[in-house]
């Protein structure tokens, strides 16, 4: 019902027929040589017949777009576009907004550096550091073989997974 993104694209075949691709992220389209057609609207159903005919129908009364904020902050790849908004651009704007708030509430001379938790926080942290004129540093290395820690069941499982997923680089923390 308009919480999670969904889009579709087409690819014209040599015989003139169209293949369709439905995906939660637009980034899959160019990677598979499909042309992004559009986002699927909240409450909309997309039907593709065996004859490769596609039609769409609104199935919900009063559908509303109520996107999950975590799509832009955490879930989506930075090179995706959701509802016409670049995920990377949204993360940069979050960094700008955070910089404005930090400048209002904190003494900037007390901040040693800006350091993201990889990977999704990186664009916002870079923008924050740039806007405030503060050094940007990488202090954590991510173990790519551990799944998404935010969505794991239970706090104990999340804590254990975070310990396995992130390794601090001691050189960035010594004397701090």
Segments predicted by a language model, with ranges:
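PRPP-associated nucleotide enzymes
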Residues: 1-176
């Amino acid at each position: 019902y308009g919480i999670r993104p969904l889009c579709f694209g087409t690819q014209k075949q040599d015989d003139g027929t169209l293949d369709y691709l439905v995906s939660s992220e637009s980034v899959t389209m160019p990677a598979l040589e499909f042309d992004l057609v559009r986002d699927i609207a909240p409450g909309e159903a997309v039907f593709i017949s065996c004859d490769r005919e596609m039609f769409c129908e609104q199935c919900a009364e009063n559908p509303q777009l109520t996107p999950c904020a975590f799509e832009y902050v955490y879930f989506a790849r930075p090179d995706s576009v959701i509802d016409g908004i670049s995920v990377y651009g949204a993360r940069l704007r979050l960094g700008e907004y955070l910089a404005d708030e930090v400048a209002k509430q904190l003494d900037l001379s007390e901040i040693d550096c800006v350091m993201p938790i990889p990977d999704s926080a990186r664009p916002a942290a870079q923008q924050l550091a740039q806007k405030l004129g503060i050094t940007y540093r990488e202090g954590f290395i991510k173990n790519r073989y551990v799944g998404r820690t935010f969505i794991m069941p239970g706090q104990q499982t999340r804590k254990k997974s975070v310990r396995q997923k992130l390794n601090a680089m001691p050189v960035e923390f010594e004397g701090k």
